[in-house]
Amino acid sequence: LQINVAANRNLERSLTFTNADGSVDYESYEGEWGYSEWRAQAGMVLSWDKWRLNWQTRYLGAVAQDADAVDDFSDAFTFSDTCLGPPTDELCRDYAEADSYMIHSISLFYNEDNWSLGMGVRNLEDKAPPLADPSEITGVKSRAIGYGYDLMGRAFFLNASYNFDLGF
């Protein structure tokens, strides 16, 4: 049995720069889109004879839009840039934050001396990435992209490999 756990806590992600008028501007990003406070990955490998079972979990902590960029009046004129429906519709709200996100993957492999076969499922629960307002973060069809979320959904796979001994 082999267990691997890696967790990262984002203590600070910031930018300080001097404006044209000489004033100093400081921007803190931790906890915002792309800079969740916590990220983790855990895996378990159980090997028995020629079999290997893998379980992997990925975790992204909750995130929120920069408080300075939140538009408190975004629905004042019955407009939402996440869909064409009324702004009171839950599916049309301004998505400025996302809950924590976790996905699981599992695979099973059989290994011989010079070949192996494997199969598995990525994103076992078919968990979609959180909804996001693409006018405020990088996104496509109200889904955040480039932040570590799985955009493909559940995926099944088969692997086969053969080691050709060429003698050199």
Please describe what each predicted stretch is.
Residues L1-A67, N159-F168:
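Gram-negative outer-membrane beta-barrel transporters
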Residues S14-Y29, Q65-D94, L131-I145:
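Solvent-exposed loop segments that connect transmembrane elements
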Residues V70, F79-A98, M102-N111, S116-G120:
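Outer membrane beta-barrel transmembrane domains
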Residues R58-S74, F109-F168:
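C-terminal beta-signal and adjacent terminal beta-strands/loops
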Residues S36-A40, S100-H104, D113, M152-F156:
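Residues that define the transmembrane beta-barrel architecture of outer-membrane proteins
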